[in-house]
Regions:
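Peripheral, non-catalytic segments of secretory and membrane proteins
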Residues: 1-252
């Protein structure tokens, strides 16, 4: 029999906030790379991938998982959890590199969006498979398909915005839209999942030393700190470049 599940709405709110800030930071970094006379830097590609893939997508996903409450003990496989994080960062990094390393044609955009979106969807379902509990997951294939479509569309739009946006206000608005899309994909994927008790299965508990609320707050704060560092570094680079450009006439 399928179990009733509920959500901790405070953690749901945190998952949305981190997705907005991660999206904004990633857009800032990518926009700075696109306008840089030095061209694409792999270090900044990594920083953007860390912000978007690690912050806006994976951290949102994991806090959203912690917000999901079922009447049984739930642990997380460290190996699969780390794999899902790695997939998110690497896939988004590849997508960003494709987007900023040359003229973003329709073919390049759609190809990068498809690859990144499918990888993000894979990250989500691998992350869900990392849940360790005395139960089995059952899926609604229609909702799974919808979540994958949302992931591909969201990734494609995100890559286009990352390359074409100018101005902090537009970036903030776009970051909110991106966060809505990322959360939409995640919670559609969660809605596709049902949970049933499996009394016959061999279950090895993975103890969590922290409650879901404590763990969610810890991950939120750690991710925010990392994103703030990335954003400050990006803004510092942008200000230094502007100072250099303003100083150029003095040398003519």
């Amino acid at each position: 029999m399928e179990m009733e599940a509920s959500y901790n709405w405070f953690l749901v709110g945190l998952s949305f906030l981190i997705s907005v800030f991660g999206s904004f930071t990633g857009l800032q970094i990518t926009n700075g790379m696109k306008s840089s006379p030095q061209g694409v830097s792999l270090l900044w590609v990594f920083a953007a991938a860390l912000s978007l893939g690690g912050g806006a997508i994976w951290t949102m996903h994991f806090i959203g998982m912690l917000a999901y409450q079922v009447p049984m003990d739930v642990g997380y496989s460290p190996g699969l959890t780390f794999l899902s994080l790695l997939i998110a960062i690497v896939a988004v990094g590849i997508g960003i590199y494709i987007a900023v390393s040359g003229r973003l044609s329709i073919v390049r955009l759609l190809g990068a969006g498809l690859f990144t979106g499918l990888a993000v969807a894979s990250m989500h379902y691998i992350g869900m498979a990392a849940m360790v509990m005395p139960g089995v997951m059952v899926y609604d294939n229609t909702l799974v398909g919808v979540s994958i479509v949302i992931a591909v569309v969201a990734a494609t739009v995100a890559l286009w915005l990352a390359v074409n946006l100018k101005g902090n206000l537009l970036m903030l608005g776009s970051a909110v839209v991106m966060a809505i899309a990322v959360c939409g994909m995640h919670y559609t994927g969660m809605a596709a999942m049902g949970m049933e008790h499996d009394h016959s299965a061999h279950y090895v508990a993975i103890e969590n030393s922290m409650s879901p609320m404590t763990m969610g707050l810890f991950i939120f704060c750690a991710s925010m700190l990392l994103l703030v560092i990335c954003l400050i570094m990006s803004l510092h680079q942008l200000n230094s470049r502007m100072d250099e450009e303003l100083g150029e006439p003095d040398h003519i």
